[in-house]
Amino acid sequence: MMGKHIQLSFAILIMFTIFVLGAVGDVDQGYKQQCYKTIDVNLCVTGECKKMCVRRFKQAAGMCIKSVPSAPAPNRCRCIYHC
């Protein structure tokens, strides 16, 4: 009977240890906030926008947006990056 109690206690200790180590690992990874910068251009081309964003910020994504919904074509390049 005593052996089963020790096995249960040991199993609970192992599970608790794994949980604590997992929680510490999540905290160590950290969370990077996303920022964006909008650049005015005459006519935004997706490929050029992405290249421009990567030049300004090492790891970035770029997308073309319109300054106003009624604009005929996208005229702004929005860079999204970790700040």
Swiss-Prot record:
Its main location: secreted. It is found in: Secreted. Disulfide bonds join 35-83, 44-64, 49-77, 53-79. GO terms for cellular component: extracellular region. It comes from the Eukaryota. One of its GO terms (biological process) is killing of cells of another organism. Residues 1-25 form the signal peptide. InterPro entries: DEFL (IPR010851). Keywords: Antimicrobial, Disulfide bond, Fungicide, Plant defense, Secreted, Signal. Belongs to the DEFL family. This is Putative defensin-like protein 150. It comes from Arabidopsis thaliana (Mouse-ear cress). The lineage of its organism: Eukaryota, Viridiplantae, Streptophyta, Embryophyta, Tracheophyta. The gene is LCR32.
